[in-house]
């Protein structure tokens, strides 16, 4: 990508709030486009300024999933047809990421299908954050810049939480690597919750591997959907003698009844990023912005600088 090529940032309907903050950080206006909705549910995308020869960054999280994904695909297609120099999809929250493997017979692999759709539509690059599974990067045949919210969270942890009595925890075994990174970086002990599920979004039983008695526990996860796992883990920590329990997660999917569960749980605080718009329905929820991080990633892509140095852990 040429460092001299001017760039433009556009937003889909779902992520305009974040795209505006990204543009404020970059010191540039948000690009003008029109998304026209029709009575039958279809919509059409058109750019309202020339993008010929420009590097075009399209900001859109794919949640709620289907319409926002289709909107992004049409934005990509329109940009290619308008002779953009390159088209970079900026997807702070990548939907379908939990469907990254064939965990039982006769199932789809949704994350691979979405990667194929984005590639076919014509993206030249993807910038995303905290994929549910790192291997999803390999589903793409274009460069993927995988950002991590850890730098945002670590600043908050070091300035706002009691480090001398803190313990890192993961609400399930699958998040062990993620939690371990925080534990090693901060020099803190770690415990693991082991769970079994009856079905999707329903936890059957859970137990703690490790000791939390008298400690301030910080649960680490990549997303919270219905909040069943995270709140069950928090309640279990308190039952086992924890002094307090907080949680951080990159993506606030927060499907019903998540807000109610968090509000009624042992959690004293639930911290998210703004990768997904969260209409605050719970006093315990705090949202940290990732706009500056994405703005810096965009700037570095345009200037040809390293992206990996943005990562703290």
What positions do the PLM features span?
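PRPP-associated nucleotide enzymes
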Residues: 1-313
């Amino acid at each position: 990508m040429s460092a001299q090529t001017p760039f433009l940032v556009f937003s889909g309907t779902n992520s305009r709030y974040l795209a505006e903050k990204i543009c404020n950080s970059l010191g540039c206006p948000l690009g003008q486009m029109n998304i026209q909705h029709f009575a039958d549910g279809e919509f059409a995308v058109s750019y309202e300024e020339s993008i010929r020869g420009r590097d075009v960054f399209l900001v859109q999280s794919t949640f709620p999933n289907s319409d926002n994904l289709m909107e992004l695909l049409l934005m990509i297609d329109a940009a290619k047809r308008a002779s953009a120099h390159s088209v970079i999809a900026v997807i702070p929250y990548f939907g379908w990421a939990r469907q990254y493997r064939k965990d039982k017979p006769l199932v789809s692999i949704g994350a691979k299908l979405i990667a194929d759709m984005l590639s076919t539509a014509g993206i030249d690059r993807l910038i995303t954050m905290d994929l549910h599974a790192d291997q999803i990067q390999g589903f793409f045949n274009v460069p993927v810049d995988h950002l991590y919210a850890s730098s945002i969270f670590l600043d908050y942890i070091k300035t706002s939480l009691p480090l001398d009595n803190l313990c890192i925890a993961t609400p399930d075994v699958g998040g062990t690597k993620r939690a371990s990174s925080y534990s090693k970086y901060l020099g803190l002990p770690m415990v693991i919750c082991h769970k079994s599920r009856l079905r999707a979004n329903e936890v059957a039983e859970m137990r703690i591997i490790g000791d939390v008695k008298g400690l301030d526990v910080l649960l680490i996860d990549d997303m919270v959907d219905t909040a069943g796992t995270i709140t069950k883990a928090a309640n279990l920590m308190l039952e086992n003698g924890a002094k307090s329990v907080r949680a951080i997660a990159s993506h606030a999917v927060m499907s019903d009844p998540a807000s109610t569960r968090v509000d009624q749980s042992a959690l004293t605080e639930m911290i998210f990023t703004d990768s997904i718009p969260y209409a605050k329905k719970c006093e315990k929820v705090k949202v940290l912005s990732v706009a500056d991080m994405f703005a810096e990633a965009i700037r570095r892509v345009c200037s040809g600088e390293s992206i990996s140095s943005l990562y703290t852990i």
